[in-house]
């Protein structure tokens, strides 16, 4: 039992940075844009309503953080391009919804990448963009 508790605590400590906000502020709200195909940077159509709803609150915030994750496929350079493209497309969408440009920050990509998934279904979950506000 003690080993299990220690193991769970260690896992939490290891995984915590992956879930931390890379823009450095306390989160008051968060949403996740999911459904990206491999290599796709365009926001999936079924996610735009959810993102627009988030933008309604985000318009009144001073800190918006956008950071993208990718799956294990592709080279580091390709994954960085895809993650940057996803984050930038979400940023542009938020701007189109009236969120102030100076409030939006793109999180550092190396802090946002987490590759927990081993199965193909897990890798689908890894292809996402987190959007948070203070």
Please tell me what each predicted stretch does.
Residues 34-44, 71, 75-80:
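Second-shell loop/turn segments in exported
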